[in-house]
From Swiss-Prot:
Protein's recorded name: Cobalt-precorrin-5B C(1)-methyltransferase
Organism field: Ralstonia nicotianae (strain ATCC BAA-1114 / GMI1000) (Ralstonia solanacearum)
InterPro entries per UniProt: CbiD, CbiD_sf
Pfam families in the cross-refs: CbiD
Reaction(s) catalysed (UniProt annotation): Co-precorrin-5B + S-adenosyl-L-methionine = Co-precorrin-6A + S-adenosyl-L-homocysteine
Record SUPFAM superfamilies: CbiD-like
EC number assigned by the record: 2.1.1.195
Highest taxon of the lineage: Bacteria
Length: 383
C-alpha cells in the first residue's frame, strides 16, 4: 500500500554525520494504527506497512511486530521503536495502537497504558488530552484515510500506548512538564535524526565551516527547525548558510570563532534563531541546552520581566510556568510583550557575543512553537 507519488525513505542511508536514523514514536504509533485498521476494516494481516511522512515526497516502511484482535472488538497492533544511533530513552520500546469503531464519524485520540496525559498548559496539546503531538495526530488521520481509500468513515477511536511506558517516562522530561502516566508520542518529520552524540558535534563543526566557506556577510544557527523559514525570508540566507546546531550552542559559537580565526575572516552578523525554551538557558550560562543537562530558565526570564516593570502577579506566573511556551501564552496579550521578548533576545545575544569576537554582531530572534515572531523579528518581518 505505497502512498501515491511518494518515494520510500531509506533508513539504511546514514545521516550526514554518518549516524543511523530512526523512527519517531509518532511514526511507530501511525504504523500500528494503520496495521490495526487494515485488520479491522479489510481483514488483512500484514507484517509491514508504509507510513506517509510529513514530507509529501516520502513514505517509510515500518515492520509490524504483532496484530491481535481483542475481545472488545478492537484490534491491537504493536511496533518496536527504533531510534538508530540517537540516545533515545524509548529505543526498543513496544508502541501499540488499539483501534475500534466509534460510529461517531470522527477520529478520536486516547491514551492507552504507557502514554501520558497532559495536565498543565504550555505544551502543544491542551490539558486533559493524551500526550500525542499534532504532527503524529495528522499522520494517523492520513493513515485512516489511506486505509478507507475514499470509503465512508464510521469514526475510529485510536488508543495509543507503550509497554512499560510509565517507567520509561521517568527518564524523560515528562514528569517536569506535567505529563503523567507515560511517554509522549512525538515527531515533526517522522524520522529520528541522531543529534545528541559527540559525533553530531563533529558534524556541526563541518557544517559551520561550510557555511563560512565563501566568507558570507551572515550565517544563521538554529537549534531545531524553528527559525529556518525566517532565515530564508526576510534574511535571504541560503540553505548552506543555515546550520542546525541542536543543543550545542556554546560549542557551535566556538566552532565559528575558530574557523573565522583560521581563515582570517570576519563575519558581519551571526543570527541565532529559535525557540526561547532552549535559547533563554544562555541567560543562566548554560551552553549545552539538552534537558538532561539543564533545567528551564524561568528564574532569569522572570527577573527580566520584573526589571521591565511587568506586573508582580504576572512575574509570579512566569516563575512557576510549566514551560517557556507557557510564558509566551501568559504574555501574549500584554501590551509590552514584544518589548519584553526583544529585551530577552538582546540579553541572550550579549552573552553570546564574547564567544565570537570575529563576528561584528550576534543577533538573536525568538519564535513561538508555531513560528510566530516574539520580539524584534516581528518588527523586521513586518517591515
Amino acid at each position: 500500500m505505497q502512498p501515491s507519488a511518494r518515494r520510500p525513505f531509506d533508513l539504511a542511508t546514514p545521516a550526514p554525520n554518518g549516524l543511523r536514523r530512526g523512527r519517531t514514536t509518532g511514526t511507530c504509533a501511525t504504523a500500528a494504527v494503520k496495521a490495526a485498521l487494515l485488520r479491522l476494516v479489510r481483514g488483512e494481516t500484514v507484517d509491514a506497512v508504509e507510513v506517509s511522512l510529513p514530507d509529501p515526497d516520502y513514505c517509510l516502511e515500518v515492520p509490524i511486530a504483532r496484530i491481535e484482535p481483542l475481545a472488545s472488538g478492537a484490534v491491537r497492533a504493536d511496533v518496536l521503536k527504533y531510534a538508530g544511533d540517537d540516545p533515545d530513552n524509548t529505543d526498543g520500546a513496544t508502541i501499540f495502537a488499539e483501534v475500534s469503531v466509534n460510529h461517531a464519524g470522527e477520529v478520536r485520540f486516547m491514551a492507552a497504558p504507557g502514554v501520558g496525559t497532559v495536565t498543565q498548559p504550555g505544551l502543544r496539546v491542551p490539558p486533559g488530552e493524551p500526550a500525542i503531538n499534532p504532527v503524529p495526530r495528522q499522520m494517523m488521520r492520513m493513515a485512516v484515510d489511506e486505509v478507507l481509500a475514499g470509503g465512508a468513515n464510521p469514526g475510529f477511536d485510536l488508543a495509543i500506548g507503550c509497554v512499560d511506558g510509565e517507567r520509561i517516562a521517568r527518564r524523560t522530561f515528562n514528569p517536569m512538564l506535567g505529563i503523567v502516566g507515560g511517554i509522549s508520542i512525538l515527531g515533526t518529520s517522522g524520522i529520528v535524526e541522531p543529534m545528541s552524540l559527540a559525533a553530531w558535534m563533529a558534524s556541526i563543526e563541518v557544517y559551520v565551516r561550510v557555511a563560512l566557506g565563501d566568507a558570507p556577510e551572515a550565517i544563521a544557527f538554529t537549534p531545531g527547525k524553528i527559525g529556518r523559514a525566517y532565515a530564508a525570508h526576510p534574511l535571504a540566507l541560503s540553505k548552506k548558510q543555515v546550520v542546525q546546531i541542536a543543543n550545542f550552542i556554546g560549542a557551535s559559537l566556538d566552532y565559528a570563532q575558530t574557523a573565522l580565526e583560521e581563515d582570517r575572516h570576519r563575519l558581519g552578523t551571526l543570527w541565532v534563531l529559535g525557540h526561547p525554551g532552549k535559547l533563554a538557558k544562555v541567560l543562566d550560562g548554560v551552553w549545552d541546552t539538552h534537558s538532561s543537562k539543564s533545567g528551564m530558565a524561568m528564574g532569569s526570564v522572570a527577573a527580566v520581566a520584573a526589571e521591565l516593570g511587568v506586573a508582580a502577579a504576572l512575574v509570579e506566573q512566569i516563575k512557576t510556568a510549566n514551560t517557556v511556551e507557557n510564558v509566551i501564552q501568559i504574555l501574549q496579550h500584554q501590551p509590552g510583550a514584544q518589548a519584553f521578548w526583544t529585551e530577552i533576545e538582546q540579553r541572550i545575544a550579549a552573552r553570546m557575543q564574547p564567544r565570537v569576537p570575529r563576528a561584528d554582531r550576534v543577533a538573536v530572534r525568538l519564535f513561538a512553537m508555531d513560528g510566530t515572531p516574539l520580539g524584534a523579528a516581528g518588527q523586521e518581518a513586518g517591515a
